[in-house]
Amino acid sequence: HPAGGDANVEHLLAALDYAVTLDQVEARIAPDQALFFINLTADEARKIAELTDDSAKNDFRRSVSCVGSTICQIGMQDSNGLLKDIFAHLEEKGIDTRKLPRLHISGCPHSCGTHQIGEIGFHGAVKLVDKKPMVAFILVDGGSEHMGSENFGKMAGNIVATKIPEFLES
């Protein structure tokens, strides 16, 4: 799974170019933006892993977002931009992300970023601050996609987008 769902095109093409030379190997795309190669031998799997060494290293880096308002015509906010800002902020601060949960971010109330099923999810919104509209996201807390404990999270608040990276830092 590429970090944030954004694959490095050169790495992806190298992996696909290698995979087409193999017998019975298939590539499959999962709904959470993951790409799986199936029917590999152990040596072939190691080679694919080597070619895609930019893959996410922990659950937090496997966070997902929809494309957001920069591409989607109905998206209210830039969900993918928010995810990149969060990654950059926490990396800059030296925060160990191995214990943070996977985020699910949608640019609007629709569920393209599956915000309802994340332990922490966000969906695009607007918040009035001093009577001025600000880019914001609704925090959705407590969702689960794990078998046996599936449930939608509850809306917990509306946070100005620029404050979300700091919120996750604490």
PLM segments and residue spans:
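Small-residue-enriched alpha-helical segments and adjacent helix-cap loops
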Residues: 2-132
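Mobile "lid/hinge" segments at catalytic clefts and subdomain interfaces of large enzymes
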Residues: 121-170
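Accessory RNA-recognition modules of RNA-modification enzymes
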Residues: 1-5, 38, 138, 154-157
